[in-house]
C-alpha cells in the first residue's frame, strides 16, 4: 500500500466544476449532443456513465451514434495492445466525419492516455483531437471542455492517479442495476499488467459513503449493484479505521438491495471471512470471478501472483464447500514469456480440475513498462494462437458439463432486455452469473423473474417462466 494518503476531491472543487458546467450551458457554440465510446472493463463502463452524466448536465443530449454527435469522447483501455489499436482506429475514422461536420469535437481519455507520453503522442499524430485527459482527471471534464471551447489548440491534462472523487453526476445505462466503485488502483504489480501504472496505487472509499450510495440506489428502485475495484478483496487497508471487504459486504447486505455482485478479486486476498459472509448472506449472489491466469507454479511466480496452484485450488474448494452451487469464472493467459508446452498443459489440467462455468481467455500482450515485457523467450505468435485454441476447446467441454447441473433447477433472472436471437425471448443473468433466456415481453425488462432451467447451449441457459 502506498504511504501517501489519497487526495479526496473537495466539495469546493466539485462546485467549481459545476460552475464550469453552467458556463458551458450558456455558450451558443457548445456541442448539443454527445456520444461516449467505451473500451475495457466495468470500471471504464462506470467512468463513462459519470462522463455522460456531466455531459448531460452541460445541456447535451446523448446521440445514437458517433456520426450524429457534436462531441465524441473515447474512454480507452490499454490492458492489451488490441484495445489500443481499436480505439486509435476509431479515432482516425472520425477525421473523415469531421470533414462533413467541422464543429465536431473529439476527446480521448482513460487508461491509454494515462501512460507516460501517450497524450502528447496522440495529439501530435491526431491533430484533429480537441482534448485528452487521464484517469485522474475525469472529474475535471467540465473545466477541460470549457478550455477546449475557448481555445484554438488542444487541451491536455494528465495528473498522477491518487485522487478519489465522489458525488459526481451519473447517467446510468440501466435503471434496474448500478455500479458502485468501492476502491481504485492496484498494489499487486503482476508482471504482465499495466493497471497499477495507469490506475495508480490502491485507495479505498470510506465505507459510510459507499453504504449511503447503496441506500440512495435502493430508494431509486435499483435491484442489483455491482461493487467495483481492481482488487476488491484488498478493500479498506488504507482507511483510517480499517474495514475488511467482508465487513463492507455484510453492511451492504443489510441495506436490502435484492442482488449484490462484485469484481475483480485476487486469489491471494480471498479470506475465509469473506467466504463465510457470502455463505450466510441474503443478497450477495452465489457467483465468484476468481482469475487464476495460469496453472503452472513457475509461471505464476514469474507473473508475481503471490499464490501457487495448490493454494488457488484450496480457495476453490473452500468456496464450493461453503456455497455448493456457486458459479465460478476466471481469467487465463496463454503465451506468457517462457511458457513451455508442459507448463501450458498444466493450465489445461487446472481448467479440467476446476470446471469453470465460464472463462475469459487471452493471448499474452506485452505492455511497455511492465516486468514481463522485458523477459526473454517471448512465445511466438503462432504457438500462442495454437495454445489458445486448445484452451478454448477444453473450456468449452468443461463449460458444457458445468452448465448441465442447472437443468431442472430454478433461477431468479434479472431481465435486461430482449434476446439478440429472438424477439419473443427475453434475456438476463441468473443468481449464478449465467445468461438465461426465456419467453417474455417488454414488461419483464428490469424485473426479477423466476424461471425453471430446461436447457443449456454454449454459454447460455434456457428457461420457462414459473
Model-derived features with residue positions:
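Conserved, mostly hydrophobic/aromatic
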Residues: 190, 210, 227, 262, ...
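Aromatic/acidic polysaccharide-binding cleft in carbohydrate-active enzymes
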Residues: 361-377
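Conserved SAM/AdoMet-binding glycine-rich loop
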Residues: 106-108, 117, 219-341, 352
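Proteins enriched for Cys/Gly/acidic motifs involved in redox and nucleic-acid/cofactor modification
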Residues: 1-235, 273, 288, 310-321, ...
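Generic beta-strand/beta-sheet core signal
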Residues: 37, 109, 195, 228-230, ...
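Short flexible coil/turn linkers enriched for glycine and charged/polar residues
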Residues: 173-176, 186-188, 284, 294, ...
